[in-house]
Amino acid sequence: MLAHDRRHAFGPWVFAAAAAYFLLHLYNILYMLNEPENPAILIWRFSGSMGLVPDAMPLIAALPAAAAFAVDLNSGFAVPAVLRSGTRRYLRSKLLAACIGGGLAPFLGRLLFVGLLHVLYRGDVAMAAEMFGPEGAMGIAFTGMAGYVGYFAGVLFVQFLAGAFWALAALAFSAYVPNVLWTVCLPLILHRIFLELDAWTNLPAWLNLSLLQDSETGLSFAPGLLAAVGVFGALIAISAVLFYRRGKRRLTYA
């Protein structure tokens, strides 16, 4: 990865976006802060699926690095960068930066929130099991400490994949329309389009990206994780190919 792109993938925008995502989750549970008797996993369940969190996640993922290609083209930096590094290396660097930066922002935001939950609330698996039972993705969290940790690890991994996709979708768009504002906003628009398609076509829950990114599809843990890896993995690959092909063509005539 080029030094310029490393600053996008691991720089201050990643941590700023992660902090914003963390604060959105915290805002959703403000009314429950005076209820420390609740189990942490119950508060977690409510925090991620309410309010602005699902809708804002695509924007959070796009902030760190998705617009880097558009910025380079508009500033004239792309041409000398390609001359120094070569087209293939330059485009791969942009893909890697968007993937890592887009995935890390929601991942770190939720990881910090998980830590806070287990400071404010009890990690009571038994009580949560009584409330929710063994159904759905949360079922594995009720099988002991290994399942409890595994549940959160799986959900955080899905968040990383979802963030990587939204960022790469925006990056691919920027190769066709190198406008910074439109590039950053594209994931929000795309997210709404997917929601409307789901409402009109009645697709399975595991194809609803809003539910899938929050592991709320109703599937048990392993099938839900496989569905997320398959769906987001395929979308990541498609976005990467679209960006690489169009980006290469655009740089040829830059």
Residue spans for each PLM region:
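Junction motif at the cytosolic side of a transmembrane helix
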Residues: 231-254
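Aromatic- and glycine-rich beta-strand/loop motifs that create alpha-glucan
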Residues: 1-18
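Helix-loop-helix units of permease transmembrane domains in multi-pass membrane transporters
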Residues: 68-104
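Secretory targeting signals
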Residues: 25-68, 96-175, 212-230
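Helix-loop interface residues and adjacent transmembrane-helix termini in multi-pass membrane transporters
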Residues: 84, 176-177
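Central hydrophobic cores of alpha-helical transmembrane segments
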Residues: 17-21, 180-194, 207-210
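Membrane-helix interface segments
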Residues: 10-13, 87-88, 92, 179-182
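Juxtamembrane non-transmembrane "cap" segments at the membrane-aqueous interface
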Residues: 120-134, 189-207
